[in-house]
Amino acid sequence: MARLSLLTLLALGSAALAKKDTFQTKCAALQHKVKLPNVHVNFVEYVPGGTNLDLPDNAPSCGASSQAVSTDMCRIAMAVDTSDSSQITLEAWFPRDYTGRFLSTGNGGLSGCIQYYDLAYAAGLGFATVGANNGHNGTSGEPFYQHPEVVEDFAHRSVHTGVVVGKQLTKLFYDKGFKKSYYLGCSTGGRQGFKSVQKYPKDFDGIVAGAPAFNFVNLISWSAYFYSLTGSNTSESYLSPAMWKIAHDEIVRQCDELDGAKDGIIEDTDLCHPRLETIICKPGAKDTANCLTGAQAKTVRDVLSPMYGVNGTLLYPRMQPGSEVYAAGIMYNGEPFQYSTDWYRYVVYNNPDWDDTKWSVEDAAAALAQNPYDIQTFDADISSFRGAGGKVLTYHGLQDQMISSDNSKLYYARVAETMKLPPSELDEFYRFFPVSGMTHCAGGDGAYGIGNGLGSYNGVDPENNVLMAMVQWVEKGIAPEFIRGAKFAEGPGSAVEYTRKHCRYPRRNVYKGPGNYTDENAWECV
């Protein structure tokens, strides 16, 4: 018996080795099999699981010199021409443990950065995964300068081109091709997801689009607007991070328990309309460490108010309350916001010397009138996507410090009004989940671990993983009624302190008891 067991083990080992060799051989042969128009293969390599992959060609500003890879995969890197004067850098990661699903990742900010962490995440879940650099390298908007083709890549063409090429490569590499196609992105990646919904409705069966940067031109102007409110760090209207903490604590004091629980988390920011007069320093007060001046209180009120244009029309909704501490060092730091500066200098005015400290709503009007390649991405008629059978799931953190979650609520309302559909009808193809305690795409004070990436992973169960929830919706017809978030005790990957079910909009979470606020069953969507 011992001899038979040994022979059996050897046979199994040989079969596994043969399987491994077959996969590696197939990977090595891929480079010479690619004969696609405008596609220039740079290299193909087999990458074993457990590798910390060096990324020497990744722009330093992208902030990733390496990426941990959890699964055996075949990596193909290429350049794809998008016009006579533009091209994208594209990578496809084909995992050994393939599930028959194709997925495209997105990007962030103004960046030309392949999001390798998303490639690793999706490939690790068995998706044939592609990611592109948006038509330029690095996080600056300078490559847009006098290069409209690069702007077009950024606006819509990069992701779509990557999808077209990626699907062809997937069919070339895997004998069975793919059965369903998906998208996963956040921020600019969220906007790209909705651009696919609006412009390329047949590209994906299921789209997960987080914190979308749609209403893009007005978002850029809104981000520029904050400097006009705060002024420089010597202005009387400026608040230091410590002062923003004072404001935040008062906002939480006024709004925390509106959901029924005192847990430091605002579950429904729509109910929160704080009055900051309560923390204005008294005349002649000697101790001003825990209060604000009248000018500073006005700044907070202005930040928490919508931005209107030259003719009084709404351009962008308010920053939702509760994000003050996280936004202080980014949006209200006494300096113009760099993405806004770059967009105005290199796209709107094509003038690298444009003075970003002089921005006004007249500039916002000029930018919106330009709207190159409809980068606004705010078309509310998504009937073609619905007709194609597509599903879109969007989420937005209610502590988002860079893109107001109120903008996602505005778009939801515009879709409902334009398509003349109540939430019960929208639910068939478009579901929106505000996530309390989540900052921009991940992180925050609450249960933000929804499985939208490596930094928020809490298992593959569809109830705990927003991407797998989309897979279940597309492939089994089971739509998510909630998305469960995990509150990590010490950050991503640490012990889960508690979980919370985040409600499908327009429902909101209310604490009913009788358990502690950490008990997800003590909450109810109403």
From Swiss-Prot:
InterPro entries: AB_hydrolase_fold, Tannase/feruloyl_esterase. It is found in: Secreted. One of its GO terms (biological process) is xylan catabolic process. Glycans are attached at residues 137, 233, 311, 516. It is an enzyme of class 3 (hydrolase). The active site is at residues 187, 400, 440. Its main location: secreted. It catalyses: feruloyl-polysaccharide + H2O = ferulate + polysaccharide. Transmembrane segments: none annotated. Ca(2+) binds at residues 256, 259, 261, 263, 265. Disulfide bonds join 27-74, 62-113, 186-441, 255-272, 281-291, 503-525. GO terms for molecular function: feruloyl esterase activity; metal ion binding. GO terms for cellular component: extracellular region. Keywords: Calcium, Carbohydrate metabolism, Disulfide bond, Glycoprotein, Hydrolase, Metal-binding, Polysaccharide degradation, Secreted, Serine esterase, Signal, Xylan degradation. Gene3D superfamilies: alpha/beta hydrolase. Residues 1-18 form the signal peptide. Belongs to the tannase family. This is Probable feruloyl esterase B. It comes from Aspergillus clavatus (strain ATCC 1007 / CBS 513.65 / DSM 816 / NCTC 3887 / NRRL 1 / QM 1276 / 107). The gene is faeB.
